[in-house]
């Protein structure tokens, strides 16, 4: 059983490293960073507490929102999804991501107080 799981993981990594464009790998690294940051904040909340609750909520909402926006960007710039997003260039998708991210962080900063 564990040998088959290891073979599936190794094949996944081989195909990911050989077939995934560099832009998507960079975006995946950003997604991993956001995921780990959100998990760290949630773990801190469980261990220490949520004394400044607005600060915790702001940070966690920022992580979740940024993750969602980055996933949307990844879907739009993936070459395999080109047929679904014919009218949107990768540059336009990135500009939309920057605009939405700016709005998200303005709302988060307003929520902090």
From Swiss-Prot:
Q: Pathway involvement?
A: Protein modification; protein glycosylation
Any one GO CC term of the record: oligosaccharyltransferase complex
Any keyword Acetylation? yes
Q: Where are the transmembrane segments?
A: 31-51, 53-73, 93-113
Q: Quick one: where is this thing mainly located?
A: endoplasmic reticulum
Q: What Pfam families has UniProt attached to this entry?
A: DAD (PF02109)
Q: Cytoplasmic side: which ranges?
A: 2-30, 74-92
Membrane topology according to the record: Multi-pass membrane protein
Q: What does this protein do?
A: Subunit of the oligosaccharyl transferase (OST) complex that catalyzes the initial transfer of a defined glycan (Glc(3)Man(9)GlcNAc(2) in eukaryotes) from the lipid carrier dolichol-pyrophosphate to an asparagine residue within an Asn-X-Ser/Thr consensus motif in nascent polypeptide chains, the first step in protein N-glycosylation. N-glycosylation occurs cotranslationally and the complex associates with the Sec61 complex at the channel-forming translocon complex that mediates protein translocation across the endoplasmic reticulum (ER). All subunits are required for a maximal enzyme activity.
Q: Which family does it belong to?
A: Belongs to the DAD/OST2 family.
Could you tell me what this protein is called? Dolichyl-diphosphooligosaccharide--protein glycosyltransferase subunit DAD1
This protein's species is Bos taurus (Bovine)
Give the classification, highest ranks.
Eukaryota, Metazoa, Chordata, Craniata, Vertebrata
Which gene codes for it? DAD1
């Amino acid at each position: 059983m564990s040998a088959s799981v290891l073979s599936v993981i190794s094949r996944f990594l081989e195909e990911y490293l050989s077939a995934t464009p560099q832009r998507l790998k960079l975006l995946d690294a950003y997604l991993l960073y956001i995921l780990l940051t959100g998990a760290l904040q949630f773990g801190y909340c469980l261990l220490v507490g949520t004394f400044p609750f607005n600060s915790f909520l702001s940070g966690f909402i920022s992580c979740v929102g940024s993750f969602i926006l980055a996933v949307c960007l990844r879907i739009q710039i993936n070459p395999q999804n080109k047929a679904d997003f014919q009218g949107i260039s990768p540059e336009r998708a990135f500009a939309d991501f920057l605009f939405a991210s700016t709005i998200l962080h303005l709302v988060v900063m307003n929520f902090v107080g």
